[in-house]
Amino acid sequence: MNWRSEHVWVELLKGSRKRGNFFWACILFLGSLGFLSVGASSYLGKNIISILPSQQILFFPQGVVMSFYGIAGLFISSYLWCTILWNVGSGYDRFDRKEGIVCIFRWGFPGIKRRVFLQFLMRDIQSIRIQVKEGLYPRRILYMEIRGQGVIPLTRTDEKFFTPREIEQKAAELAYFLRVPIEVF
């Protein structure tokens, strides 16, 4: 969701609460539970789940490996669920022409630096950069170059849905709003 007026442009960012993350967290959790139950069944010598016959699986080495995969999958699934719960990467970009201030806010992992808040003066913005990498894994990233600070990414690196036309359109609108040039790399 974006909001724009004559003097203010606010762009909200979704973060880690995406359908794909929910899907993979569920698949990983259920798959790792299956592996762990087969490993436990082979250790106990009984079927814990009647769907998965595990009496033919020896505990050493197959049951141990299945248990290890199950535990590793639960750890990775827990990590995904925590990033979804904490909504890591969400936030907003606010460009205020009236006040001459740019604010960038993102949520991070819990801790001292959970809230990432950057604030710049608009006159310090040198340009809007577009980085385009074509090939097997194409990337189109929008950056803002700040005098004395370097470049700050405005789009996520995993967003592959931007077509060249969409990224050019977004860069042109933002550069026009901020009154800065566009650079392409």
UniProtKB/Swiss-Prot annotation:
GO terms for biological process: photosynthesis. It holds the Pfam family Ycf4. The chain crosses the membrane at residues 20-40, 57-77. Its main location: plastid. The keyword Plastid applies. It is found in: Plastid, Chloroplast thylakoid membrane. Keywords: Chloroplast, Membrane, Photosynthesis, Plastid, Thylakoid, Transmembrane, Transmembrane helix. It is a multi-pass membrane protein. InterPro entries: PSI_Ycf4_assembly. The keyword Protein biosynthesis does not apply. One of its GO terms (cellular component) is photosystem I. It comes from the Eukaryota. Seems to be required for the assembly of the photosystem I complex. Belongs to the Ycf4 family. This is Photosystem I assembly protein Ycf4. It comes from Agrostis stolonifera (Creeping bentgrass).
